[in-house]
Amino acid sequence: MRLDFVTLFIFWEGTAVASVFLIWARGTEGAYYTGMRYLIIQIASGVILVAGMALHYHETGSLAFGALTLGSLGTWAILIAFGIKAAFPLLHTWLPDAYPAATPTGTVVLSIFTTKLAIYSLARSFAGTEILIYIGTVMVFWPLIYAAAENDLRRVLAYALNNQLGFMVIAVGIGTPLALNGVAAHAVAHILYKSLLFMAMGAVLYRTGTAKASGLGGLYRSMPITALLCIVGGLAMSTPLFAGFVSKSLILSSVAKAYEPLIWAALLFGSAGIFYVAGVRLPYLAFFGEDKFAGAPVRPKEAPWNMLLAMGLTAASCFALGLMPATFMSFLPYDVAYDAYTPDHILTQLQVLSFTAIAFFALWRFGLIKRPAPGILVDSDWLNRRLALARAL
């Protein structure tokens, strides 16, 4: 099969059409309208992509899917199309809207494929494009604001996913072999630990009927294995001995070697922020704190064995890749010597993670952080609501 923009477009639109059924499978009226919004935005990205392809072909006579520079209207259109699917700032609202609306299994599948296609496309066409460094930096910070206040824990994970995409976009912007290895490694690690967290919240939704923090708490008493696996998913984001530590170390090192100290500091802060919202706050709100089921006639049961098996295998994969970094990195696209387990990498991450956890529990203990109240956070999708796209078509 020829690897050109025509082939990319076919699969680009194919993923959009196929994935919307994962949302509609939820079977609710809200899921139907969410699916329509998702489909409109994804098809729009395809239209922009084909327009960019046509302009690029007119300018160069080529449809080769390779390195591009932002020197023409066509390549800018292609970048915008990629940016929609990669959830660039202000183009990202479909992600926290659609992912929590899907079935528990559908959310996991969406988190694996949809945005990773865009990251692959960016890495193939725009590696070393400086503007991506700054776009990615905004992506690291912007979603944390919403994730820290969101009540729906599956939406928290959707915003956390957006944050992690920012790490990959920054590395694509750096564009060195080490950075692109970091993109590939982090895409794999992110698929594993974010799938584990989405599965844990899916199990909670399956057993309790809600993923809202305002209605959860104390579940560790009846879902201890799910609680443990959720904690493992949080640790796998950047704790030594897990896959996320190896992949984030690659990205942080590539940024440091590119002499971008402010971006490096931003990524370190972003690592702390995402561990706060998804690695500490999310498990605490779901499984600990006030027991919301203490007076219930029947307590929720532990997740079914098939869910536990899927989560267990994913957790083991996170651990295996972190425990064998040389094997992990042997599958990366570039042959670059790198040691993730140096004392400075380990100490830096452990300091960031431990101080973040201590800060959360200290703030919670003194009442400075409270369980979120029911409600809807209005993101930059307020325009959609104004234009009544909530009931499009």
Regions picked out by a protein language model, each given a short descriptive name:
Residues 57, 202-206, 322-334:
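Juxtamembrane/transmembrane-helix interface segments of polytopic membrane transporters
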Residues 10, 18, 51, 166, ...:
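Hydrophobic mid-bilayer segments of alpha-helices in multi-pass membrane transport proteins
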Residues 110, 296, 303, 307-321, ...:
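Membrane-interface and transmembrane segments of multi-pass membrane proteins
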Residues 159, 321-322:
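Generic beta-strand/beta-sheet core signal
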